[in-house]
């Protein structure tokens, strides 16, 4: 491991000490794009340290010669070998070994799942923090057969859906369809009996027929919506074309969940408002929004941006489009922070998009074709000027507001009553600057501890309150691709699941990986203990970390840790590493072994890769507030 004994005097010394120097820039080949001059692109070659020039064909057919960019330009990597800064550039800047998970991340983003059955089943991983490569985005945009398939589906049945539709048990689906056929038969018989030619005429005959027609219309609307949904899922290759239609079964639910993941929707396979809206946009518009979201990831990572407008409850748009659904802009009843930072990510993404010549589906597809057929995937763009507070190193602190804390087990009647009354969810706020100049950069939903099952030494499982630490803490260790080593108190059943009808070990929960219990990034909460002439850091097992358990972030609790969406955790890690000094500690090998049992079966867990560690210098102060404990009189 490498540690700094004093601040480096030069960037060269920073590299030797494995300490990142934010001013350092990597030389290479990239495209130069000016947002002021519209869509101007040309190839530039660099021979470090002297900048070079080159001439190439510009977008639109013009030709020009440009110099290598200097002050005011941001280099954005749009290639397939890109990985987020914590998995790549942060260690590379210190000349250190790269995290082992980097190549796995790149493979997953390119749709190469190897032997990872869970990733292959998840398919679209953007919602879990792994945005697809632009080659995959372009392949979707170029799939005209898929677009025509979607175009042929009438929008009416889905637009008529007013309440969420969910998976229905097989028996209920069969009975619903039998009832539909019976109702159709009754209506047909009534039409023949009275010699009328339409259900509208039949409705007007008497109130009884009016009720019968209304029943038929409602049943047919449900059936038509399910069939239209399934047709869209077939177009996207998420369902088999010849599969039975008309029942919202498990197959449909899983296919819809994959559609939701691909289109940035927090869902579990239910047909809700966000999903209906997405289906109504059309496949070309959805692919354009996917391209813009991927560009947003790359731009925010390159520029080290974190400000998304959440601190003031005002999220910007990109090319007139709100790229995030309401659940990913969750703020609850909290008012805007007076010192909240404006959204910087959306304007930066729009500047990059316009500089690339992206304005609609056709121009974006053409731009991607040109970019990905060229010899370089790096572009240099002029982004909006940074605010005065944005400097490096940046004074930072974080506050976790626990919100309304329910102190009773939600499985009890009292706990359910308190949970329903709780309105303020836990939030994480990151501040920059000091005193009157302090700015709130983001305010994101998170979790705090709650009531969970715990295994005793006798192997008996009991319910216990797993609270979060309160008071002053510090983020010192930042870990990317962390593995979760379940404590002995974790019940064996929580480490097992059923797959293809068989009990299996939840390898993905252990990690490293996007489905790890710690997600793609974790920050350890240390308590500083002073002893006069020296101090030491205590680790109580609490972390701020990424997670794919998005529903828990919005409505649930944790075992004491503070969960974030994986993309938020990655963005936070990138921001910290680009705005603070740090030491590269590298991979930490720590052996973990445990036997997991259920009647007649046993599994052996073995891990030795705990994750890739960075040490923030100095640590970032974190204050975990008590929140407002919900209490009620016992009846």
What are these regions (language model features)?
Residues 17-20, 30, 46:
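Low-complexity, intrinsically disordered or signal/transmembrane-proximal segments
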Residues 30-42:
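Bacterial N-terminal signal peptides
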Residues 47-635:
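N-terminal pre-domains immediately preceding structured catalytic cores
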């Amino acid at each position: 491991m490498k540690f700094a004994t004093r601040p480096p005097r030069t960037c060269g010394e920073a590299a030797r000490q494995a300490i990142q120097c934010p001013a350092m820039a990597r030389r290479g080949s990239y495209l130069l794009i000016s947002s002021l001059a519209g869509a101007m692109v040309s190839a530039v070659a660099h021979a470090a340290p002297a900048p070079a020039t080159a001439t190439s064909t510009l977008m639109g057919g013009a030709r020009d010669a440009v110099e290598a960019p200097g002050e005011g330009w941001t280099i954005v990597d749009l290639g397939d070998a890109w990985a987020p800064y914590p998995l790549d550039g942060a260690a590379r800047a210190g000349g250190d070994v790269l995290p082992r998970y980097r190549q796995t991340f790149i493979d997953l983003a390119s749709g190469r799942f190897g032997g990872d059955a869970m990733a292959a089943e998840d398919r679209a991983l953007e919602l879990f923090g792994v945005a697809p490569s632009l080659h995959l985005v372009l392949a979707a945009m170029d799939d005209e057969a898929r677009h025509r398939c979607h175009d042929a589906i009438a929008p009416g049945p889905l637009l008529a859906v007013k309440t969420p539709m969910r998976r229905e048990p097989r028996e209920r689906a069969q009975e619903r369809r039998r009832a539909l056929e019976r109702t159709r038969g009754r209506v047909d018989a009534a039409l023949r009996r009275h010699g009328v030619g339409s259900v509208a005429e039949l409705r007007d005959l008497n109130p009884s027929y009016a009720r019968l027609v209304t029943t038929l219309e409602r049943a047919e609307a449900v059936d038509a919506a399910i069939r239209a949904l399934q047709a869209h899922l077939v177009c996207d290759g998420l369902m088999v074309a010849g599969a039975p239609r008309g029942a919202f079964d498990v197959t449909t639910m899983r296919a819809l969940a994959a559609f939701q993941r691909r289109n940035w929707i927090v869902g579990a396979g239910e047909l809700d408002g966000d999903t209906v809206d997405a289906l109504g946009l059309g496949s070309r518009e959805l692919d354009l929004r996917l391209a813009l979201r991927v560009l947003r990831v790359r731009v925010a990572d390159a520029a080290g941006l974190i400000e998304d407008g959440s601190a003031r409850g005002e999220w910007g748009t990109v090319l007139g489009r709100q790229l995030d659904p309401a659940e990913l802009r969750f703020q609850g009843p909290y008012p805007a922070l007076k010192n909240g930072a404006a959204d910087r990510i959306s304007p930066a993404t729009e500047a990059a998009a316009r500089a690339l010549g992206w304005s609609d589906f056709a121009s974006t597809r053409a731009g991607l074709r040109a970019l990905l057929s060229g010899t370089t995937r790096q572009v240099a763009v002029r982004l909006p000027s940074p605010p005065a507070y944005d400097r490096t190193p940046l004074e930072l602190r974080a506050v976790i507001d626990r919100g309304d804390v329910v102190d009773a087990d939600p499985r009890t009647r009292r706990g359910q009553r308190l949970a329903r009354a709780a309105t303020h969810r836990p939030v994480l706020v990151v501040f920059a600057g000091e005193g009157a100049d302090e700015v709130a950069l983001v305010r994101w939903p998170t979790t705090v501890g709650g009531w969970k099952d715990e295994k005793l030494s006798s192997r008996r499982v009991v319910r216990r309150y797993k609270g979060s630490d309160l008071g002053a803490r510090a983020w010192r260790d930042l870990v990317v691709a962390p593995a979760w080593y379940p404590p002995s108190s974790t019940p064996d059943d929580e480490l097992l699941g059923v797959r293809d009808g068989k009990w299996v070990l939840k390898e993905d929960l252990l990690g490293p990986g996007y489905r790890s219990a710690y997600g793609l990034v974790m920050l350890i909460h240390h308590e500083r203990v002073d002893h006069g002439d020296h101090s030491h850091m205590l680790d109580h097992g609490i972390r701020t970390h990424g997670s794919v358990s998005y529903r828990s972030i919005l409505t649930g609790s944790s075992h004491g840790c503070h969960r974030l969406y994986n993309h938020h955790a990655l963005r936070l890690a990138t921001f910290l590493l680009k705005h603070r000094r740090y030491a590269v500690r590298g991979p930490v090998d720590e052996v973990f072994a445990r036997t997991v049992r259920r009647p007649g079966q046993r599994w052996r867990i073995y891990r030795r890769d705990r994750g890739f560690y960075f040490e923030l210098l100095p640590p970032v102060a974190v204050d975990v507030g008590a929140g407002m404990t919900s209490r009620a009189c016992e009846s």
